[in-house]
Amino acid sequence: MFSYIDVVAGAQFGSESKGRVAGDLVRYRSRQAHWGADTNSSSHPVISVRVGGPNAGHVVVGRGGQHFAMRQVPVGFIEDDAILYIAAGSEVDFDVLDSEVRMLHEAGYDIMSRLYLDPQATVLTPDHIVQELNSDIVERLGSTAKGIG
């Protein structure tokens, strides 16, 4: 029996392809289970966790080489059997999440039955964005003005 925990973390301010690497790992682990490399794959599902907020996009390559830039949905959506989890400590903008879910549905990905949101994730509201824009945090910290700062 094999069990894996793969963690993709970065220490750089800005893009370093964490999303692409995470997507590749989900694809690899999912296919390992399908090929029988993991004899207990049903008891060890592939889980793709997103921790963060809509201020950062992660590009992943889906079916047919289509590129997706995701800001809320975990990149593991590319594998139909992956469980998608937005973790505690994440910031969620429901407008962005809804837009991504709809876009993925139109592209042929059914994620609603496998997308979970931790009840301790922070819900961003338009007020958060306004407060950030009205402060000096955008200039001082290089904020993306998405309500996270």
Model-found features: residue ranges?
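Non-transmembrane, aqueous-exposed alpha-helical and coiled segments at domain scale
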Residues: M1-I148
